Amino acid sequence: MRYITSGESHGKQLTTIIEGLPSQLPITAEDINASLRRRQGGHGRGKRMQIEKDTVDIVSGVRHGYTLGSPLSLVIRNDDFKHWTDIMGEEPMEDPSKMRRVVTKPRPGHADLNGALKYGHRDMRNVLERSSARETAARVAAGAVAKKLLKELGIEVSGYVKEIAGIEASDLPELNAQERADKANQSPVMVLDATVEEQMTNAIDQAKKEGDSIGGVCEVYVEGMPAGVGSYVHYDRKLDSRLAGSVVSINAFKGVEFGIGFEAAKRNGSEVHDEIAWDETHGYYRTTNRLGGFEGGMTTGMPIIVRGVMKPIPTLMKRPLTSVDIETKEPFKATVERSDACAVPAASVVMEHVVAFELAKALTEQFSSDQLPQLKKAIDDYREEIRCF
């Protein structure tokens, strides 16, 4: 199971193609649209969210509400394209000298300069249009399908904000995945701990007022994954490694940790590892979950807890950073595209869906998965097998 996306930020549309989905998975456009609406929410979003009202068209791979087993194609139209038809059109220009909104000034912290060097673009709009976080809408669409598959398999995934601008939300370990999702969806900053909401919104408002930006930490919590998914045999089959790669592939994410994460460096081994226990009902389990649901690159059967750190968005309104024009080689203060003061709440939704897809991919690789009933039976049989091991 895999997916690819295509499309530019101000182009006609974003497209997602998912290959390897089992047949007979119930799915509707609304299942995906609900996730797209969540991605567009959260305090601190910019004006682009007032323009785009993301909805998906399912153009192949589904018939009468069920997947066929063939590639699933999803399209999200860019409403803003009507204002960019001349700039982003696919046909050659009769007079290239009349090209508008040419970008020759790379913005620090963005892909502009590196992408121009790699692909030879003198107009860096060719870079920033694809490297834009607008593409994450297509990734959320893919993840929404994966979440529907995981739910059919008894696995729940929830994402939320853990920290913004150094303001940290308290842990609420008593909450299950659905309760976490409900709380996050009721919060303007998608946080579980309501006592820090006002502090976080004030920090976002202050950053916006000052023309600056702030980052934070997102957390994803997964319940219901059976033990032994992933592998210790080869480095590239370790599931925690694959999850880490998928998280830092999200725009502006610069770090990832599982369980207690980097805190482990400050503790003795006796305070890090999770002791093993067994009972007749559950089989093997851990008495703690400091390692976040992973040992040896495989799931332990405990909840997966993964966090990702998002840097502040580099587009600064009133405090632009210095760069160099690639045509004149003269220094300048970075130009501004529409941007958010804080996109951490929305990023928690993106991270949730990226993690969901990687987990669904791992399950369809490990278990027979041409048909959903076949996949369900294979996983149920495996759960019973390891319970009695």
Swiss-Prot record:
Task: Extract the coiled-coil ranges from the record.
Answer: none
Record's cofactor remark: Reduced FMN (FMNH(2)).
Q: Where does FMN bind?
A: 130-132, 251-252, 296, 311-315, 338
Q: Which reaction does it catalyse?
A: 5-O-(1-carboxyvinyl)-3-phosphoshikimate = chorismate + phosphate
Q: Which cofactors are required for activity?
A: FMNH2
Matching InterPro entries: Chorismate_synth, Chorismate_synth_AroC_sf, Chorismate_synthase_CS
Please name the GO terms of the biological process aspect recorded for this protein, alphabetically.
amino acid biosynthetic process; aromatic amino acid family biosynthetic process; chorismate biosynthetic process
| Record EC number | 4.2.3.5
Q: Describe which pathway this protein belongs to, using the record's wording.
A: Metabolic intermediate biosynthesis; chorismate biosynthesis; chorismate from D-erythrose 4-phosphate and phosphoenolpyruvate: step 7/7
This entry carries the following GO cellular component terms, namely:
cytosol
Q: What keywords tag this UniProt record?
A: Amino-acid biosynthesis, Aromatic amino acid biosynthesis, FAD, Flavoprotein, FMN, Lyase, NADP
Q: Report the GO molecular function annotations.
A: chorismate synthase activity; FMN binding
Q: Where does NADP(+) bind?
A: 39, 45
- The protein's superkingdom reads Bacteria
Q: Which family does it belong to?
A: Belongs to the chorismate synthase family.
Give the record's subunit note.
Homotetramer.
Cited function: This reaction introduces a second double bond into the aromatic ring system.
- NCBIfam families in UniProt: aroC, PRK05382.1
Q: PANTHER family under this entry?
A: CHORISMATE SYNTHASE
Q: What is this protein called?
A: Chorismate synthase
Source lineage: Bacteria, Bacillati, Bacillota, Bacilli, Bacillales
Q: Which gene encodes it?
A: aroC
